[in-house]
Amino acid sequence: LKTDVTKAADVKALVDKAVSSFGKIDVLINNAGLMAIAPLSETKVEEWDKMIDINIKGVLYGIAAVLPIFQNQSSGHIINLSSVAGIKVFSPGGTVYSGTKYAVRAITEGLRHEVGGAIRTTSIEPGAIDSELKHGSSHEESSAHVKEFYKQAIPSDSIARAIAYAIEQPDDVDVNEIVIRPTVQEF
């Protein structure tokens, strides 16, 4: 089912389809993201809007779609993909991206406080992972910097294993955060 995470109705339709197909939903992984890196002085306002729409609103729309279901079934697990840039500002050029990823961490932690107990929350903070994320910038100099940075990337299945680890824990164990990056990555 094609889903645009910037549209709450699309995300709700995806969740509804999962419930109608499988009878329930156990886990939501908010994984969509955009990393449009450029110095603030470049005023890439349209890219800022897209990052906010995808990286923050997309997470909120996912939560809004599953939370009533999880509360009704007294179980569920929401996993949000943040970034190491949500722990330390990625600069130069990553100020807005980092802001969106700090927001994802805050939303995940706030959600844990609000609905903890039967509903688990996990924030995954990836470093350089081999994915399409590195292609999000229209700023040439920043894009070259990002491509150089991603030469150290580890395979995306590293993230899949981290997510599986969080999901596979007993119901009374909540893995709140996982930071995962290449061993050679300093940032």
Predicted regions and their residues:
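Active-site loop-to-helix junction immediately N-terminal to the catalytic Tyr of the SDR YXXXK motif
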Residues: 43, 89-98, 110
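The beta1-alpha1 cofactor-binding region of Rossmann-like NAD(H)/NADP(H)-dependent oxidoreductases
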Residues: 2-13, 45
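Substrate-binding pocket helix/loop in short-chain dehydrogenase/reductase
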Residues: 39-40, 47-52
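Residue(s) in the substrate-gating loop at a strand-loop-helix junction
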Residues: 83
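Active-site helix of classical SDR
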Residues: 63, 100
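A glycine-rich helix->loop->beta "capping" turn
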Residues: 17-28, 36, 120
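C-terminal helical subdomain
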Residues: 123-124, 143-186
